[in-house]
C-alpha cells in the first residue's frame, strides 16, 4: 500500500454509521499523486505525495516540481 513520502499518510480505517447507528467498516484514502519533485534541493525523485502535502510544500518552497 502506498503512503506519502513526507508525512507518511496512508489509508485510515473506521466505521460508517447509519441514522440508526448501525456500523459497517469503511476506509478513508489519502489523495496520493505520483510526482517528480526536488525535496529541499536534492536530486529529482519520483515519490507519492498527498495533494495537501504537495500544495503546502510548493507554497513554502521546500518542494520544487521537475
UniProtKB/Swiss-Prot annotation:
BP-aspect Gene Ontology terms: translation
GO molecular function: structural constituent of ribosome
InterPro entries per the UniProt record, alphabetical: Bacterial_rp_bL28 (IPR050096), Ribosomal_bL28 (IPR026569), Ribosomal_bL28/bL31-like_sf (IPR034704), Ribosomal_bL28_bact-type (IPR001383), Ribosomal_bL28_sf (IPR037147)
Cellular component aspect of the GO annotation: ribonucleoprotein complex; ribosome
Residue spans of biased composition, Polar residues class: 13-25
Swiss-Prot/TrEMBL keywords: Ribonucleoprotein, Ribosomal protein
Matching Pfam families: Ribosomal_L28 (PF00830)
UniProt region (Disordered), positions on chain: 1-26
Xref: NCBIfam families: L28
Protein family: Belongs to the bacterial ribosomal protein bL28 family.
Protein name: Large ribosomal subunit protein bL28
Lineage: Bacteria, Bacillati, Bacillota, Bacilli, Lactobacillales
